[in-house]
Amino acid sequence: MQMCRDICAPAYVEAHTPAAMREELARQRGEGWAFYLHSTADVPDGLVGVCHKTGEIGHLFVKTEARGQGIGAKLLEFAIKKLPEHPRPWLAVLDCNTGAMGLYRRMGFAPDGVRNVFDPATDPNSTRLCRELILRRCLPESGTR
C-alpha cells in the first residue's frame, strides 16, 4: 500500500478500503481469478492472484515486515506453477516499483510493453509520473543448437 500512497492522490487511496477491496476481489473471482494467501506461523503475510483465462499474475503483495525473506519469490513461483497452460505468464508492475522489478527480472520476466501511463498532468488520481509495464516470463533456453 505504501507504493500507492507514493504515487496516488489521497482520495484514491482512501477509496480502497478493505470492504472495497473485498468487493473488487469478488468481482475478479467471477472473471476467472484465483487468489492464494501465504502465511508464516499461521500469520498471513502475502497474497498472489492468477487468472487462468489470460495467464496474468497479479495482486502479488508481501507485508512490509515480512519482506526480504523470499516470500515474494515463493509466491511468484507458486503462481507460475498454477498456470501450466500458459508457458509465458505475464504481470503488470509500475516502473517506479524497483524492488518488484528486480524480483520479476530475477524470476525470468522481461518487459513486453506498457499498459498504462499515470501522469499527474492528465490523471487526477496520480501524484507522480510512472508507467505500468507488462512483463512476460521468458521461455527457458532449450539448450539445442
Feature names for model-found ranges:
Residues 129-145:
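Terminal substrate-recognition subdomain of acyl/acetyltransferases
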Residues 82-95:
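Conserved GNAT acetyl-CoA-binding A-motif
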Residues 1-65, 76-78, 82, 138-140:
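Acetyl-CoA-dependent GNAT
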Residues 54, 95-97, 115, 139:
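Short, flexible active-site-adjacent loop segments at beta-strand->alpha-helix junctions, enriched
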Residues 90-93, 105, 110-133:
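Conserved catalytic-core motifs of GNAT/GCN5-like acyltransferases
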Residues 43, 59-77, 94-102, 106-107:
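Conserved glycine-rich acetyl-CoA-binding loop
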Residues 16, 46, 99, 120-121:
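Short secondary-structure capping/turn micro-motifs that flank functional sites
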